[in-house]
UniProtKB/Swiss-Prot annotation:
Xref: InterPro entries: CyaY (IPR047584), Frataxin/CyaY (IPR002908), Frataxin/CyaY_sf (IPR036524), Frataxin_CS (IPR020895)
Function: Involved in iron-sulfur (Fe-S) cluster assembly. May act as a regulator of Fe-S biogenesis.
Chain coiled-coil ranges: none
Keyword Phosphoprotein: no
Family assignment from sequence similarity: Belongs to the frataxin family.
Gene Ontology terms: cellular component: cytosol
Official protein name in the record: Iron-sulfur cluster assembly protein CyaY
GO molecular function, one term: ferric iron binding
The organism of origin for this protein: Yersinia pseudotuberculosis serotype O:3 (strain YPIII)
Cited CDD domains: Frataxin
Gene responsible for this protein: cyaY
Keywords carried by this UniProt record: Iron, Metal-binding
Amino acid sequence: MNDSEFHQLADQLMLYIEETLDGFTGDSDIDYETNGGVMTLTFENGSKIVINRQEPLHQVWLATKAGGYHFNYRDGHWYCSRSGEEFLAKLSEAASAQAGENVSFG
């Protein structure tokens, strides 16, 4: 994958997350802000999730209250470099824990 392909895939992922949050109908208020390729989700309890791209490594990084994770793209999905867990599943798990209700990204 070249840098251009990486940016296109990372942009698609960020847009999908934004669209999912815009359509969220739960009780929790989840705000998001994207600045310089870094997306920050802020929850009512003040906790945050940070998603950012690491261009030199062609990875997307996810930072949650539970820990930090690095994801590589293969076979149409982003997978954790340690656990093999898919990005949207991990994001759903973390967002649900931090929101105190089910938040699904896929």
